[in-house]
Amino acid sequence: MIKTIELFAGVGGFRVGLEKESNKGQFSIVWSNQWEPGSKVQSASDIYVKNFGDENHSCEDVTEVVNKRFKTIPDHDLLVGGFPCQDYSVARSLKKASGIKGKKGVLWWSIYNIIRKKRSKAPRYLMLENVDRLLKSPTSQRGKDFAIMLAS
């Protein structure tokens, strides 16, 4: 059994994929988090809960959880997440892309901090999803953000 946490879970795409790929119960989602900052309505989280239940699901700012209630994040073997892409997306020009320093780009550090704080119990596996412009955005740092993530 591969104990898995799902960050930036949205409506549960990673979970559906993992469960569909391994119908033998190989993956167990032990904790999930979905939070849309600045929004009173948490539609994605509501859909996640409707589909999978609210047990072990967190609908709050992941940065707050990591900084103030870290011990509530269970030990896990696999961390999956599609961290927000707005600061890398083609919806912005390369000059306006903020990258890892942007409002949403900084959420990468929540992933990093979970791994760092778990130390000897850090997950063995990490599976992340983002847009291809992560490799070349922002213009002022061409590829440095991705290099920082890999080095972390």
Task: Give each language-model segment a name.
Residues M1-S152:
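Conserved active-site and SAM-binding loop architecture
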